[in-house]
Amino acid sequence: MANIKAKKYYSYAKINLFLHILNKRTDGYHNLQTWFTFLDLKDQLTFSFNNSREINISSNISIAAKQDNLVYKAIKKFQQSYRVQDIGVDIEIKKNIPMGAGLGGGSSNAATTLIALRDYYLPQLSNEEMIPLAAKLGADVPIFVYGKSAWAEGIGEILYHKDFSPQYALLIKPDIHISTKEFFTSEDLIKSSVLISKDLGFDKSIMHNDFENVFYAKYPEFSQYLKELDSDFRMTGTGSCFYLLSADKNKLEQLARKINKSLDKWLVKTLNYVY
């Protein structure tokens, strides 16, 4: 077993270039199609393994209690799946990825935790071998274990490496939110009925986020505000973060200066690889 003390890992954000919701499965989940790419917006997790047999998690922001925390759940799933006993670790999470944004911050932290545990306890285990375990923690966790831009199907666990031409991204996050349950039960949700080929290039005319209609129907004023800024803003995941892609950084910088000061915003770059 490796002797690792206070090892730091970066935990990156993602965006969905599109998100199509398909049929409901017998297990209650929905099949989907999406294309993930990463952002250089990232959290930092520091793992200090020890012999205490205790799991301690701290952060620079208020975080969920252990039983509701995805990092803690990742540790317990790792223990159960690989029969690793008596894990002792202190984890410090420095959060930069906003929560409740659709950027996958919590899922990314969970995936980073699986990777740190693997590095310490089972270094022979590959990232790909951990994807089935990651899927048990949530639909977005597998892509962060995979670590490469990818086309995803199933509930997000069937992944095909697919690069996306690097761009700058302007992120906008309003202080509003819709629960996942509300999205799926909304009358404004129009699910996609046709599978599209993973061999397609990025085509905004047929690739969209099925959840956007729900968000716009509930918040029409924000919808209108976005369209006035630029009609190509898109929602990632279930929001509430929207992004605009461009190869022209100056264009996005100019637009950022026009954004209402009540909105959080970031100017970042897309990444095809995070490991």
UniProtKB/Swiss-Prot annotation:
Belongs to the GHMP kinase family. IspE subfamily. One of its GO terms (molecular function) is ATP binding. One of its GO terms (biological process) is terpenoid biosynthetic process. NCBIfam families: ispE. The active site is at 14, 140. InterPro entries: GHMP_kinase_C_dom, GHMP_kinase_C_sf, GHMP_kinase_N_dom, IspE, Ribosomal_Su5_D2-typ_SF, Ribsml_uS5_D2-typ_fold_subgr. It comes from the Bacteria. The keyword Transferase applies. This is 4-diphosphocytidyl-2-C-methyl-D-erythritol kinase. Keywords: ATP-binding, Isoprene biosynthesis, Kinase, Nucleotide-binding, Transferase. Gene3D superfamilies: 3.30.230.10, GHMP kinase, C-terminal domain (3.30.70.890). Pathway: Isoprenoid biosynthesis; isopentenyl diphosphate biosynthesis via DXP pathway; isopentenyl diphosphate from 1-deoxy-D-xylulose 5-phosphate: step 3/6.
